[in-house]
Structure formats: structure tokens, C-alpha cells
């Protein structure tokens, strides 16, 4: 039925919580935890249900277009309602409301589909004829103050049909408003325009920022879901809201109840307990069936279980699952919930690590770059994870845009915790606070002095800038001209500020150890001044050791060769490789900037660590901690910059899932934390790379080996299309056995996940089976 005006008399609570006051509405809809109404004077009102089951007004209308000019000068906003219609012909009422912008600059149409569980909101700006705008927002007017607001990126698991690895796609950007009485309001902003373009701290608490077109017109459409909860249990409320927004009748949650590493699904015991819970979001009894398959890294199906649930209206039911991991390493739980016509599927990766107490953190060369702190970062968990992984050094951004605060208070607090854990910290001051390139050395110097006055005592060293030789290419300068700028501004400004703070001066990381830039550092005398030479090495999607030809730019080992040759010529110096690694870009499988699959990221990372040690690198930092850039943290499966992480970005529910590379990294640091020297040795085969590592532990030695006999489909200049691969399926099909002479009484082969087996030492020799995934041999003399 389509009607222009519908009259209801409803009993609702007003904003002061009074019950029993009668008000007349032109239209009213009552959901489980909210009410939407249009008053007699054509004002929209939104009410929420409190945990005490009282109805209170929360929003004066759903929102207003607000368009601003330069210096945030107000230009136009949504004025009062012109008319509205209600369509009740379908399962859920649809309300269409028309507004005019002020000064008749355009029209706004709002379409609300009203479900019992939530409101689906579509807003359109039409016939815009106003002035050029600088910015625009969709502003909500709260009639009752909220206690706090949280912001989160929301992802949805996608399962490719070609048997490639599952991955998350961007679903929505969530604002969660918490109220003093325990209730919550959720805004799930969806669509391409919702993809965060800035750090979450910069987003307003009460408004949705809109994009601007090149001709300075505001975004014309936005879509979001509005969900309310009267549930005081925040975790349960958050989960119910997410599934309500998905328009599902039931909600699934799956978590490990065994103590792990903070919010990360990292465990140091094999006996694990999981809790599977199904919640009914409707007022009718619901049946659901949840299947759980857990796959091991070796391809085995370690658990296959289906649980049936019968859940009363608005209720929940739980089932416990016990799991004993047969080996160390990464596991993937695939969960599928079926309820009526609804199907929901997700992935729960977790890792079982060998328990270990690190003893050589002060001297271990292994670190992680791209460690961020901020209001919307898992700060405490980040530090716990670093400790569990055995990261002995980190690089942390110091510029205000990187942690999105007005001062260094939050940064200082977390750096202090990091330092207390024994982890060495190198700060990086990248750009000025407005994220612009410095042009005046004095301005740059003062900016660095300002931050080091606050946090310098917590650092071991400070790096100024990042990959200047690559910036030269981006900006279209010759390397010689940009080197002159680097000397006159970056070095001249940064060096005195860093040295006066009593810190090591780390020159800006040289991308790929480019020879012309290294020679420029020597020519300008910077090499003599800097305490540490910093380089970055990348080669994705190619294997790190595809070639060692120094003339090849996009080659990891070639970058090491170039740097080693330069240091041998100019005089050795401390050398940090504080960026290396590979992205697992799910939706970019072709081209020189494409990524690798999850297993290959771990395998190639292990190769990079051994290669770097063998060329004399003093500190090696894998990039990066999480799948996020330094300025904004969102899910972007098509962008390689957002997929370098050892871990996925923390999900909507607060969980931090590891990739295989996280488990591999933890195992490598456990084996090699006391490494003193690494050198390449012959394995008797042209297609096997082998390395001997001397350890501080008396009577112990470690070998690292892998085979290059098999090359993956994207490990060639001729064909760089990645072959689809599931993370529990070994991508290496060819094996190569080599015989190596050793001076040892026993030998134990360890895989990247931490599992080991004995091999006999016969006549001073051992036989080792190799593939493209490195293995380690622990020798006891």
C-alpha cells in the first residue's frame, strides 16, 4: 500500500526517559531495539531501547547533508521535509522522504527500508546547483550525549571459485556509539566511497565524511545500515549488530577460549578449546547447522565436525569444541552456518607455536618494520605479539600523521612499554606534520627536535626520510638533482637534531641498494657521518634469489650484492635492512607489482632472512606487522601496499589472525636468535642454496637450505601470473635430496612451522630433502 500520510498515536518515552507520554505521529515503525517516527510537524525522530527496556530519543532525524566551503564555511544543509511516502506492499516498509537543500541548491532523497533488526538507509543528493564546495558531511544530530565512540573497518571473507586462498574484502566502515546506560548504536557505512581515505582518528564522531568530485561537487549517494542494541554484553551486542546488518536471522561467533597472545590467535600449546555460538536475532525459534573443518599446513583435514542448534527467539546456544593440534604451525578453521535459506561462511586462521623463552633479544638481528601505535591500533597486543614472535628490534613512525594524535603522549606511552620489553626501537621521522616534503632544513630540524625532545630517550636510533631515490623517480627529478636536495635539506636538517639527542643517525633507507644513490652518499660525505647505512630490498612477485646480477634492479639478492660491493669499496659500516618482504595481494595476480600466495610469502621471507645474514646485514626488519599502510588502515585486496603484513588487520571483532609468515618468522627467530655469522656453503647441487650459521650456543650450528629447481609461475619475467593456491596445499611439488658433510654427532631437520625430525649422521654426512620452502638443520657437535 502506498500512502502519503499515515496517522498513528503511539506511547513512547521522551528524551528525559519519561514513560506514558502520548504523542501523535504521522508515521511510526517499531523494531526490536529502535523506533522510527515522523511527527505531526514533519520532523523525523529515531528512538532506541535501553537495557532497562525504556525508549529514549537518540537522533533528531537520521541525518543531514552539510556542505562546506573554504575554511569550513557552511554553504548548504538539508532543510525541512518537503513530503514523504510509505510503501508497505512488501515484507518490510519503505519510507521515502524528500528534502530541499538550503537556498534551493539541490534536493535530498532519503529511502529507509525498515527491518525489525535495523534500518537500511540510502541517501541521494539530486539537482545540485550550488557553489563549488571544499568538503561535505552527512551529519547526525544526537539528542542524548553518547559516552564514547569506536570506529572499525569491517571485512567479509571471500572464497574464490578458482581454489585460491580465501581473503577479506571491504564491507563497511563502522561507527559504534556507546551510551552510559549500556546500549549501543551502530552505523555501518557501505560502498566504494566508504573505503577509508584517512586514518580512523581523523573521522568525525558524529558525521560521515563524503568525497568530493574533481569539479568540487559533493558525493551524490551514500548507503549505510543503522543498528541499535539494548544488550549490555558489548561483544555479544557487536556480533549481533554485524549479522543484523547482513540481514541474517542468526549470528555466528567462533573463538578459542584457550589463553593466547592477547587478541592474536597465537598459542603455545597444542590442546585448544573453541566455543561456537549461534544467536537468534528474530522473535521466532530458529534452527541452524554449523560445520567446522580445520585444515593443517601439511594439507591434512585435522577436524571435521557439524553441530546442530535449535535457538529460542532472541536467544543463543553454545557448543564447545576440543582440538589437539597434531603439529606446530598454522591452521585454518572454515566455518559454514546454514539457517533456513541463509548461508554464512568465514575463516578462522590460528597458529600453534613451540613454547620458547628468548635469551638473546639484545643481540638478535631480527626485527619488524611498520609497527604502528594509535587510538585505533591494538597497542598492548602489538607489543605482546612482537615478544612472542621474537622480534628484537622495530621501526616505529614518529610523525604525527602516523599515529594521528595532537601530541606524543600516546606514542610515548607505547614506546616506553616497548622499550621495557627489551626490544630495540629505531624511530623514523618521515615527512612534516602536514605530510608534506620538507623544503627548509631549519624547519625539518626543528620538527625532528620537537618529537625527539619527547621520545628520544626511548630510541636507539632515528631514521630521517624514506627511499629518497625512489621519490626522485616519482617526482621526475634526476638522481643527481634529488641527491643535492637530500643533502641540503634532509641530511642538513636531520643530522644535528638526531645526534644532539644522543641517537644513532640512520640515513633514509635506500630503495634496492641503488648504486648511483649509494655513490652519492659517499660523494657528499654523508656515509662518513651516518652511523648506519639503511637499505630496502624487494623483488615481488619474484623469488628473492632469482638472480644476483647487480645490473638487475628488481631483485632482492641483487640489491644485497650492490650494497655489499659498495661497503667493501668504501669501508664497512653497520648495515640495516629495515624493509623486506612480500605482499599477499589477493586480487592482483598479474604484473610486476602483484603479490604472492600465503605460503610463498613465508617461504620467500625465510630465504630473504638467510640471504641478508649471509651478506653481512646487521639488523633485518620484515615489512610489515599488519596488512595496513602507515596513514590509513583498511582492507584493500587489490592494493599491494595494504597486504605486506605478517598478520591481517585486526578484524571487527578485535581478533588478530596470523598468516603462515608469522608462524615461520617465530620459528626462525627461535632457531637463529643467537646467530653470530652466516655464510653460504656448497650443497653439491647447482639448484640448492645452503647456508651455515654459527650460533652463540656452544656446540651448536645451524644449516639453512632450499631448492631452486622448481620455479613458480610468476617467478619469471615472461610469465608473472600467479597460480591459485590454498594455504593448506603445498605449492612445491618437486623435491631434491642433497648430501652435506658435517662435523656433528646428531642432526635434526626443522621445517618452517617448527616441526622437526632426526636424520642420521653417517660417515660425517647427512642427507637432507629440500623443496622451495627452506628447512633448517640443527647440528649438535
Stretches found by the model and what they are:
Residues 270, 277-279, 284-286, 682-743:
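Carbohydrate-binding surface patches
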Residues 28-30, 168-253, 297:
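Beta-strand-rich recognition/accessory modules
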Residues 20-28, 120-195:
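Polysaccharide-binding surfaces and accessory modules of carbohydrate-active proteins
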Residues 481-608, 615:
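Noncatalytic carbohydrate-binding groove/subsite architecture in carbohydrate-active enzymes
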Residues 217-236, 758-781:
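C-terminal beta-strand-rich structural cap/linker in extracellular carbohydrate-active enzymes
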Residues 382-388, 392-450, 454-455, 478-507:
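Aromatic-lined substrate-binding rim segments of carbohydrate-active enzymes
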Residues 23-102:
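Acidic-aromatic substrate-binding/catalytic surfaces of carbohydrate-active enzymes
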Residues 582-583, 588-665, 682-683:
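Aromatic/acidic polysaccharide-binding cleft in carbohydrate-active enzymes
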Amino acid at each position: 500500500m502506498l500512502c502519503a500520510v499515515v496517522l498513528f498515536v503511539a506511547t513512547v518515552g521522551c528524551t528525559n526517559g519519561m514513560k506514558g507520554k502520548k504523542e501523535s505521529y504521522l508515521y511510526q515503525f517499531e523494531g526490536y531495539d529502535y523506533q522510527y517516527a515522523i511527527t505531526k510537524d514533519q520532523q523525523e525522530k529515531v528512538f532506541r531501547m535501553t537495557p532497562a527496556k525504556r525508549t529514549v530519543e537518540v537522533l533528531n532525524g537520521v541525518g543531514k547533508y552539510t556542505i562546506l566551503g573554504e575554511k569550513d564555511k557552511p554553504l548548504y544543509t538539508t532543510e525541512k521535509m518537503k513530503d514523504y511516502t510509505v510503501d508497505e506492499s512488501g515484507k518490510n516498509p519503505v519510507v521515502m522522504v524528500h528534502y530541499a537543500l538550503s537556498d534551493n541548491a539541490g534536493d535530498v532523497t532519503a529511502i529507509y527500508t525498515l527491518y525489525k533488526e535495523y534500518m537500511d538507509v540510502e541517501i541521494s543528493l539530486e539537482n545540485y546547483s550550488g557553489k563549488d564546495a571544499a568538503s561535505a558531511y552527512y551529519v547526525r544530530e544526537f539528542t542524548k550525549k553518547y559516552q564514547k565512540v569506536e570506529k572499525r573497518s569491517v571485512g567479509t571473507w571471500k572464497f574464490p571459485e578458482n581454489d585460491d586462498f580465501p581473503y577479506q574484502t571491504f564491507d563497511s566502515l563502522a561507527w559504534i556509539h556507546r551510551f552510559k546506560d549500556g546500549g549501543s548504536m551502530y552505523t555501518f557505512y557501505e560502498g566504494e566511497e566508504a573505503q577509508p581515505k584517512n586514518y580512523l582518528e581523523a573521522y568525525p564522531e558524529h558525521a560521515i565524511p563524503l568525497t568530493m568530485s574533481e569539479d568540487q561537487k559533493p558525493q551524490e549517494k551514500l548507503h549505510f545500515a543503522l543498528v541499535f542494541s539494548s544488550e549490555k554484553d558489548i561483544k555479544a551486542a557487536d556480533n549481533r549488530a554485524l549479522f543484523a546488518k547482513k540481514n541474517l536471522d542468526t549470528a555466528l561467533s567462533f573463538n578459542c577460549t584457550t589463553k593466547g597472545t592477547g587478541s592474536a590467535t597465537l598459542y603455545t600449546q597444542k590442546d585448544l578449546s573453541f566455543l561456537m555460538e549461534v544467536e537468534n536475532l528474530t522473535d521466532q525459534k530458529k534452527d541452524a547447522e554449523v560445520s567446522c573443518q580445520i585444515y593443517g599446513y601439511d594439507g591434512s583435514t585435522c577436524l571435521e565436525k557439524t553441530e546442530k542448534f535449535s535457538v529460542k527467539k532472541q536467544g543463543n546456544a553454545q557448543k564447545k569444541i576440543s582440538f589437539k593440534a597434531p603439529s606446530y604451525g598454522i591452521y585454518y578453521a572454515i566455518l559454514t552456518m546454514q539457517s533456513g535459506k541463509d548461508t554464512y561462511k568465514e575463516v578462522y586462521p590460528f597458529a600453534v607455536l613451540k613454547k620458547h623463552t628468548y635469551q638473546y633479544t639484545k643481540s638478535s638481528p631480527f626485527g619488524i618494520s611498520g609497527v604502528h601505535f594509535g587510538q585505533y591500533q591494538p597497542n598492548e597486543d602489538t607489543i605482546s605479539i612482537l615478544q612472542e614472535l621474537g622480534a628484537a628490534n622495530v621501526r616505529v613512525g614518529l610523525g604525527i600523521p602516523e599515529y594521528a594524535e595532537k601530541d606524543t603522549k600516546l606514542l610515548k606511552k607505547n614506546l616506553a612499554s616497548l622499550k621495557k620489553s627489551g626490544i630495540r626501537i629505531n624511530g623514523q621521522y618521515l615527512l612534516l606534520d602536514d605530510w608534506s616534503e620538507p623544503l627548509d632544513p631549519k624547519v625539518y630540524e626543528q620538527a625532528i627536535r620537537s618529537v625527539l625532545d619527547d621520545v628520544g630517550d626511548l630510541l636507539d636510533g632515528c631514521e630521517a626520510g624514506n627511499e629518497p631515490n625512489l621519490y626522485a623517480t616519482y617526482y621526475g627529478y634526476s638522481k643527481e638533482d634529488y641527491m643535492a636536495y637530500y643533502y641540503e635539506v634532509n641530511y642538513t636538517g636531520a643530522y644535528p637534531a638526531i645526534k644532539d639527542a644522543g641517537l644513532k643517525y640512520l640515513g633514509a633507507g635506500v630503495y634496492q641498494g641503488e648504486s648511483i644513490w649509494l655513490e652519492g652518499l659517499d660523494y657528499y660525505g654523508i656515509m662518513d657521518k651516518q652511523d648506519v647505512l639503511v637499505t630496502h630490498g624487494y623483488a615481488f612477485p619474484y623469488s628473492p634469489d632469482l638472480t644476483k646480477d647487480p645490473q638487475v634492479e628488481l631483485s632482492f639478492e641483487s640489491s644485497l650484492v650492490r650494497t655489499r660491493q659498495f661497503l667493501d669499496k668504501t669501508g664497512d659500516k653497520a648495515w640495516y635492512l629495515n624493509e623486506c618482504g612480500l605482499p599477499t595481494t589477493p586480487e592482483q595476480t598479474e604484473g610486476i607489482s602483484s603479490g604472492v600466495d600465503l605460503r610463498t610469502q613465508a617461504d620467500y621471507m625465510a630465504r630473504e632472512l638467510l640471504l641478508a645474514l649471509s651478506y653481512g646485514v646487521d639488523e633485518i626488519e620484515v615489512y610489515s606487522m599488519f596488512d595496513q599502510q602507515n596513514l590509513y588502515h583498511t582492507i584493500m585486496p587489490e592494493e599491494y601496499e595494504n597486504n605486506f603484513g605478517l598478520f591481517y588487520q585486526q578484524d571487527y571483532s578485535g581478533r588478530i589472525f596470523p598468516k603462515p609468515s608469522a608462524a615461520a618468522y617465530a620459528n626462525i627467530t627461535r632457531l637463529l636468535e643467537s646467530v653470530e655469522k652466516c655464510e653460504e656453503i656448497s650443497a653439491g647441487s647447482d639448484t640448492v642454496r645452503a647456508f651455515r650459521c654459527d650460533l652463540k650456543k656452544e656446540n651448536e650450528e645451524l644449516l639453512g637450505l632450499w631448492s631452486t629447481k622448481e620455479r613458480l609461475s610468476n617467478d619469471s619475467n615472461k610469465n608473472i601470473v600467479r597460480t591459485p593456491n590454498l594455504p593448506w596445499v603445498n605449492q612445491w611439488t618437486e623435491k631434491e635430496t642433497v648430501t652435506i658433510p658435517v662435523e656433528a654427532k646428531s642432526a635434526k631437520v626443522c621445517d618452517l612451522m617448527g616441526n622437526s625430525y632426526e636424520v642420521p649422521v653417517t660417515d660425517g654426512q647427512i642427507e637432507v630433502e629440500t623443496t622451495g620452502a627452506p628447512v633448517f638443520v640443527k647440528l649438535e657437535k
